[in-house]
Amino acid sequence: MYESIIPFPDETASTVDKYCCSHSTSLPPLFADHAAWTVDKFQTSYMMCCPLQAQMCVFLASDRRARRVLEIGTFTGYSALAWKEGMKAVGGEVWTCEAGPRAIAASKEAFAKYDPEGKIHLVEGPALQTLREINAGPFDIIYVDARKAEYIEYVEIILERHLLAENGIILADDTIHLGLVADRSSTNPHSAREDIEYSLQHADNVYKFNEWAVKHPQLDVLLLPIFNGVTLIKIKSQT
């Protein structure tokens, strides 16, 4: 279908999301339990990826036979658990970094409960510091979901330190940001949000990253209008 980006009203989008989840390989029960716990404990639970996105993470890690995943931004550990699930056949490991004290405490609790094998390694501290110091790579998948103003620096360090494995892939999350990177007019209902100034600041940072990434001579980039925008990045072939 040539006009392939189909907008749904909220009610239809919710129904379509449930349909997609039910027609994708299901997640183990621990994901529903941990999501419910996060919603109960955190007013900012919207920062957690949705079940369908977790299903995507599991699928990608499994399909690519990943053995090492680096996650920039842990929150309560939901997506880290998804990456681990996708690598269970090969015994892969996840390194996930987080700076927020509440998120660190929550993710520690989650990993103690759901990762008794110790396959998930929580790295505490700012993401930029972690990227400059981590020596566990190279990584088959690097998932970026932290401070939008630092996205460019994250990828620069990844390239500089050769943290991405050969044929590895970077996923940058939230790269459409409510559609505000492309449309800030009144036709976008999010342009009337109460927190519009905050949202526009995020959109500005994401816009700069998108422009930088697509023009980078070393990178192949695919920006997809799924979830809140997901950008797939790989290093260009040298042949």
Curated annotation (Swiss-Prot):
Belongs to the class I-like SAM-binding methyltransferase superfamily. Cation-dependent O-methyltransferase family. GO terms for biological process: methylation. O-methyltransferase; part of the ank cluster that mediates the biosynthesis of NK13650 C, a highly modified cyclo-arginine-tyrosine dipeptide. Within the pathway, the cyclodipeptide synthase ankA acts as the scaffold-generating enzyme and is responsible for formation of the cyclo-Arg-Tyr diketopiperazine (cRY) from L-Arg and L-Tyr. The ankA product cRY is desaturated by the cytochrome P450 monooxygenase ankB to yield a dehydro-cyclodipeptide intermediate. The gene is ankF. It comes from the Eukaryota. One of its GO terms (molecular function) is S-adenosylmethionine-dependent methyltransferase activity. Pathway: Secondary metabolite biosynthesis. Coiled coil: none annotated. S-adenosyl-L-methionine binds at E71, G73, T74, S79, E98, A127. Keywords: Methyltransferase, S-adenosyl-L-methionine, Transferase. It catalyses: NK13650 B + S-adenosyl-L-methionine = NK13650 D + S-adenosyl-L-homocysteine + H(+). It is an enzyme of class 2 (transferase). This is O-methyltransferase ankF. Its EC number is 2.1.1.-.
